[in-house]
Amino acid sequence: MSGIIATYLIHDDSHNLEKKAEQIALGLTIGSWTHLPHLLQEQLKQHKGNVIHVEELAAHEHTNSYLRKKVKRGIIKIEYPLLNFSPDLPAILTTTFGKLSLDGEVKLIDLTFSDELKKQFPGPKFGIDGIRNLLQVHDRPLLMSIFKGMIGRNIGYLKTQLRDQAIGGVDIVKDDEILFENALTPLTKRIVSGKEVLQSVYETYGHKTLYAVNLTGRTFDLKENAKRAVQAGADILLFNVFSYGLDVLQSLAEDDEIPLPIMAHPAVSGAYSASKLYGVSSPLLLGKLLRYAGADFSLFPSPYGSVALEKEEALAISKYLTEGDSFFKKSFSVPSAGIHPGFVPFIVRDFGKDVVINAGGGIHGHPNGAQGGGKAFRAAIDATLQNKPLHEVDDINLHSALQIWGNPSHEVKL
């Protein structure tokens, strides 16, 4: 294979999956085939999309009821020649799913890149090992928290929140994705003030915390803004990838003047991936493509919290982020939304040690504040790695957290 293989889930009301697959393969490449003269067929053969797999799936009555028609469900795979497109994500996505995304009940499930094509993408600049080296933490999941309620607040409020989270043992603190450039907490001021706080905490408590600052602005201003962040001493860039595009992420990741890890936020991605019938699968969008384009971290809904993703999908995202690939470093999985200490054993059981445990309200809502919330999570992480039930841990902060949010992991065995 020298190009790319696209895998689709289709729902076809003509009940002829083979014919539908061939129509897609031709429609997204040379347009027609059977009526072409033999000489022209020979000329265009190398550009023709080729159907390589058609598999009928069992009927799904709920889908038929929802669509108000009977359809035949199936998985099809089509190979697209590299000759047809330039080696970039805009060209790849337009070739494999451009006008097809408007054509009925079709979902792009996966893209399989040839080795030749993989070479055109940067992958994570730091990856899991690089992030762990920055923090000098190699033996446990990382703990991340989020600034909460920052809109309309000043730098003093930010510094207080940051200090409390760092003292609580949090490894990474990230901006809220809805915190943009503003007069009260402008980008460079957040970075400089944050560095002062984190250095003070490190000198006093010996715990290192990194700050992920939200990179925002107009598309053509992003690189300049990122370079200002670098000059100010930023640790990590948080980036709302799907508000801008995967190619913009790649452009940032490839720039040697922006030598920072990039944390990809999933904002807006639900518009592409939420439907079971249309769009792009979450594992492809939030897993494989983010990793290829250069994300060191990928945030996505966990299977447990307030915006839950189906467990199978969440694990598939993580698989794409962390599976062995000689072309790319591994990216950190960050299952998120509604996470509290009682979920820690689930997260470690399902995602392993190479995961970032991300909490907002589960830290800030603790009765002992963000310091207590962070310490509760750290106690839960330590206990889980020792295979010790959380309710047996003699830690006042963890005990308080379990009283508030419960202990759904009571019977979890690692």
From Swiss-Prot:
The modification N6-carboxylysine is found at K174. It catalyses: 5-methylsulfanyl-2,3-dioxopentyl phosphate = 2-hydroxy-5-methylsulfanyl-3-oxopent-1-enyl phosphate. NCBIfam families: PRK09549.1, salvage_mtnW. Substrate binds at K148, K174, D175, D176, E177, H265, G338, G360, G361. It is an enzyme of class 5 (isomerase). The lineage of its organism: Bacteria, Bacillati, Bacillota, Bacilli, Bacillales. Mg(2+) binds at K174, D176, E177. This is 2,3-diketo-5-methylthiopentyl-1-phosphate enolase. Pathway: Amino-acid biosynthesis; L-methionine biosynthesis via salvage pathway; L-methionine from S-methyl-5-thio-alpha-D-ribose 1-phosphate: step 3/6. It comes from the Bacteria. Catalyzes the enolization of 2,3-diketo-5-methylthiopentyl-1-phosphate (DK-MTP-1-P) into 2-hydroxy-3-keto-5-methylthiopentenyl-1-phosphate (HK-MTPenyl-1-P). Homodimer. SUPFAM superfamilies: RuBisCo, C-terminal domain, RuBisCO, large subunit, small (N-terminal) domain. Keywords: Amino-acid biosynthesis, Isomerase, Magnesium, Metal-binding, Methionine biosynthesis. Belongs to the RuBisCO large chain family. Type IV subfamily. InterPro entries: Diketo-Methiopentyl-P_enolase, RuBisCO, RuBisCO_lsu_C, RuBisCO_lsu_C_sf, RuBisCO_lsu_fd_N, RuBisCO_lsu_N_sf. One of its GO terms (biological process) is L-methionine salvage from methylthioadenosine. Has no RuBP-carboxylation activity. Binds 1 Mg(2+) ion per subunit. One of its GO terms (molecular function) is 2,3-diketo-5-methylthiopentyl-1-phosphate enolase activity. Its EC number is 5.3.2.5. Its cofactor is Mg(2+). The active site is at K99.
